[in-house]
C-alpha cells in the first residue's frame, strides 16, 4: 500500500499577499527601531548634559553627602528651608518611598520607625569614617554613625565591615547601571553609562560614576525564526524583511533571490550570526 504525499499548493495571489505582509512588517519594524533609537540618543544627550552641569556645580561633593531629590528640595523651599527642615523632609521622603516598596525593611532609607536597629541602616542614613590608607582588597572595620534627625533603636555609632576598594572597583552585582538601546550590539561595541553602588555597599570615593559596558540588548528577533524563513521564503526576500532590511529585501524579491545565489548567501550569513536585525539588537 503506497503512502500518498500531501503537498500544500500556494497560488500566485496568496504568495503576493504573503510577500506584501513581510514587506510592510519589515518597514514598520525598521521605522520603529530608528525612531526609538533617536529618542534614546536625545535622552542620553540630555542626561549627559544634566550630569555634566551637576558635576560642575558640585565639584566638592564627597561620598558622605546625602543626595536630596528635587521633590524634597521643593518641599524644603515651600516649608521655609533650614537644616532641621531639610533633614526632616529627607526622612519623610525616604519613608514614603519605602512604604510603597515591596522589598521590605532591607530597602528602607531613613525610616521614622524607632524600632529599627541603628546598625541595620544603610546609606544615605549613615556616615562612615573611611580609612583611605587601607590595603586594597583587605577587609576592615569602619566606624559609622547615624545622621541627625534619624530615629533608630540602639547605639547610634557602630562598627561595620567593608572591603578596601573604591566604588568603581566593586562587582557588577553590587552596582545599578543604566542600560542603552541606542547602541549596535552586532558590532560588539562599548557604551558609557552612569552606575551607582547599592545602598548596603561601603566603598571609597564617589558612589556614582561612569563606566563602559558592552552593548547587549534585544528587540524580540529570534535566530531560529530568521533561519527558517531564510530556508523557506528566502528567495522572495522574506528573511530580509523580517530582520528589518527592507531595502535589500525589495532587491532580493525582484531578482528572485539573486537567481538563488543571494538566497544561499543569506542562509549562510544568518546561520553564522553574521546577518542580524537592522536595528543593531541581538537575537533571543
UniProtKB/Swiss-Prot annotation:
Free-text disruption phenotype from the record: Viable but females are sterile. Reduced adult lifespan. Adults display climbing defects progressing in severity over time due to age-dependent decline in neuronal function. No morphological defects of the eye, wing, notum or leg. Eggs produced by mutant mothers fail to hatch and embryos display neural hyperplasia. Some lines of mutant flies show reduced eye size and nicked wing margins, however these phenotypes are probably due to disruption of neighboring genes.
Membrane topology: Multi-pass membrane protein
Cross-referenced InterPro entries: TM2 (IPR007829), TM2D1-3-like (IPR050932)
Tissue expression remark: Expressed in female ovary, mainly in nurse cells (at protein level). Expressed in the brain at low levels (at protein level).
Residue ranges with Low complexity bias: 52-63
Cellular localisation: Membrane; Vesicle
Note: The name 'almondex' was given due to the slight almond-shaped eye phenotype of some mutant fly lines (the '-ex' denoting the gene is located on the X chromosome).
Function summary: Positive regulator of Notch signaling during lateral inhibition and boundary formation. Interacts with Notch signaling at the membrane, at the level of gamma-secretase-mediated S3 cleavage. May regulate Notch signaling by regulating the subcellular localization of N/Notch in a context dependent manner. Maternal neurogenic factor involved in Notch signaling-dependent mesectodermal and neuroectodermal specification during early embryogenesis. Functions cooperatively with bisc/TM2D1 and amrt/TM2D2. Required for maintenance of neuronal function.
Similarity-based family: Belongs to the TM2 family.
Protein name listed in UniProt: TM2 domain-containing protein almondex
